[in-house]
Amino acid sequence: MTFRKNLLALAALSIFATAAQAADITVSAAASLTNAFKEIAEKYQAKYPDAKVQLNFGASGALLQQMSKGAPVDLFASADQATMDKAEKQDLIDPKTRHNFVQNSLVLIVPSDSTLQLTKLADLKKADVKKVAIGNPASVPVGAYTQATLEAAHLWKAVSAKAVNTQNVRQSLDYVARGEVDAGFVYG
C-alpha cells in the first residue's frame, strides 16, 4: 500500500507542477480521492511554500457540472473514465494533459462492530441485512459500478430495495462507520 501511495503522490505532484508551475492551483477531485489529494497538496505546498492549493471534493458528476458552469479548475480527477470522457467532449479539459494515474477497486464494507457474516455478494439478500449504502447510480461512479456489479450477479433488484443512496463514497463510508447501515459499497 505504501508503494501505491508513493506512486500516486509522485504522479500527482508531477501533474500539479505541470498544471501550475509552482503557482496557486485549484483541484476538483472525486470524494474517494480526498485523503490522497490532501496528502499530495501538503507535499506540493512543502515543495512550493508560496503556492496555495484549493481542494474541492465531491461526486464526479457534480464536479463536472461545476466545471461546465464556469468553476475555475486547474486539475480535475474523476472517479471514473466516463466522467473524464464527458469533460473532454465538453472541452473542459485538454486531452493532451489527461493522465490516468490511479485506479479504484469496488469493495463491500461493514461496520467494525458488525456480527454479519458477509462473504459473498449473495449474502446481501439475507433478511438481517436491512440497509446497504450505495452511491446514487445516476450521479456517483461508485453507485454505477455497484449497480453494474450487482446486475451481473443478478442481485440488483433485491439489494437496491435495501439501498440507502448516498451523494458520494465518503458519505457511504460515514454511514457504515456510524453503523447507520449494515453494509456499504466503497472504493478500496
Predicted regions and their residues:
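Exported/periplasmic ABC-transporter solute-binding proteins
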Residues: 12, 22-48, 52-61, 65-69, ...
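Bacterial N-terminal signal peptides
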Residues: 6-17
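N-terminal secretory signal peptides that target proteins for export/translocation
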Residues: 1-3
